[in-house]
């Protein structure tokens, strides 16, 4: 999809109303990970350099339409001031006379941050009146919050009815790389899809199947596919109601000549607990009473083998119970293999992104997506409301 970007407009002396995703983790009022704030810097710096008056807005947490200081963006304003090397004024609200006065007093290159837009329930209701009030803070609407692009909220979609709408650099980058995956990926194209449930990933699997040369299926959902193929899976996760769906998917993969890689060996445990003792099973079949928790060495070697020649790779979702250290090796190793691949590599989805960040590999990945649910819906082929309003 081709979107309008900030380079398509002259921002000199204009008020740029920028929707960012500053939904950062906080502990006792302190930011524990500022990745999302840093991701917005290129857009903010560019707008400043063009002489814009930059008005930033975001949500933080789930205040459920009520003013709750626990979810104030004050810590974000403080961190932004440090990163930008200038004072970022924190405004007491996101609409109203006090905000209007502060915005009208801005000079070119100034940056202010509006208070949490989710202090108003009308934000998530995509209320026209609220979007109109927000629009009074800007001349041009810039959406740089890909992480919320799948939500039709006042600040992600509704504003486009009242202001010219463009995408920031982060939005443009997400659209470019995820779009490339869906439209014309260079072959060989390898899709690695993990996660616990077939039900939550089947739409992505079906969307990527016709474009893939090889598809790796891992995580808890792999056991439903192994069951379809006649293997015993012990006490591993099984979605009985998705047996037919999985069977039909494997049949379609065969018809399309897509090589599907399922686990060839396993790391298992007797109980689904963090302190369970890992046991290795050198076979596709899992013994009775055992639960599949991670992929084994044979499976990892097979994945490494297909990634060596891959020209395009998309990885979404963990290959094992990544949150338990004893069962995180499969996901960690796949992160290494993807990082070593010489082709275009795109990683999206909470746990796969966490793995890449945990092992300091993000610099070696072509594109690490900032959107969890948004990335997933984009890869499913859905039209995202926050991107649709930016189309050329």
Curated annotation (Swiss-Prot):
Q: Where, in this chain's numbering, is ATP bound? A: 201, 292, 323, 349-352
Compartments where located: Cytoplasm
Which cysteines in this chain are paired by disulphide bridges?
Answer: none
- Claim: Oxidoreductase is one of the keywords in the record: no
**Keywords carried by this UniProt record:** ATP-binding, Cytoplasm, Glycolysis, Kinase, Nucleotide-binding, Transferase
Q: Of which family is this protein a member?
A: Belongs to the phosphoglycerate kinase family.
**Which protein is depicted?**
Phosphoglycerate kinase
What organism does this protein naturally occur in? Answer: Borrelia hermsii (strain HS1 / DAH)
Gene transcribed to yield this protein: pgk
């Amino acid at each position: 999809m081709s979107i309008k970007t900030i380079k398509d407009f002259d921002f000199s002396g204009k008020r740029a109303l920028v929707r960012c995703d500053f939904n950062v983790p906080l502990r006792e009022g302190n930011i524990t990970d500022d990745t999302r704030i840093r991701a917005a810097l290129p857009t903010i710096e560019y707008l400043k350099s063009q002489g814009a008056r930059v008005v930033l807005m975001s949500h933080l947490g789930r205040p459920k339409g009520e003013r709750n200081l626990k979810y104030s963006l004050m810590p974000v304003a403080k961190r932004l001031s440090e990163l930008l090397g200038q004072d970022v004024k924190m405004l007491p609200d996101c609409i109203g006379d006090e905000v209007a006065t502060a915005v009208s007093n801005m000079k070119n290159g100034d940056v202010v941050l509006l208070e949490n837009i989710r202090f108003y329930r009308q934000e998530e209701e995509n209320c026209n009146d609220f979007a109109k009030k927000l629009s009074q803070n800007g001349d041009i609407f810039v959406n740089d919050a890909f992480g919320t692009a799948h939500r039709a909220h006042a600040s992600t979609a509704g504003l486009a009815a009242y202001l010219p709408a463009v995408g920031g650099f982060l939005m443009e980058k997400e659209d470019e790389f995820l779009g490339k995956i869906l439209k014309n990926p260079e072959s060989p194209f390898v899709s690695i899809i993990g996660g616990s449930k077939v039900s939550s990933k089947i739409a992505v699997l079906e969307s990527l199947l016709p474009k893939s040369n090889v598809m790796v299926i891992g995580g808890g959902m792999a056991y439903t596919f192994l069951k379809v193929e006649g293997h015993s899976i012990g006490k591993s996760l099984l979605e009985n109601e998705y047996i037919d769906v999985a069977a039909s998917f494997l049949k379609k993969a065969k018809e399309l000549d897509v090589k599907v890689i399922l686990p060839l060996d396993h790391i298992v445990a007797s109980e689904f607990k963090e302190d369970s003792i890992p046991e290795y099973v050198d076979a596709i079949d899992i013994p009775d009473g055992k639960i599949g928790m991670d992929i084994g060495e044979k499976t990892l070697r097979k994945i490494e083998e297909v990634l060596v020649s891959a020209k395009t790779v998309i990885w979404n979702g963990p290959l094992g119970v990544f949150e338990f250290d004893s069962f995180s090796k499969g996901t960690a190793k796949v992160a290494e293999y993807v990082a070593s691949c010489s082709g275009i590599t795109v990683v999206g989805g909470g746990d796969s992104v966490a793995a890449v960040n945990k092992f300091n590999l993000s610099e070696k990945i072509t594109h690490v997506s900032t959107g969890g649910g948004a990335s997933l819906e984009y890869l499913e082929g859905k039209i995202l409301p926050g991107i649709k309003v930016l189309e050329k």
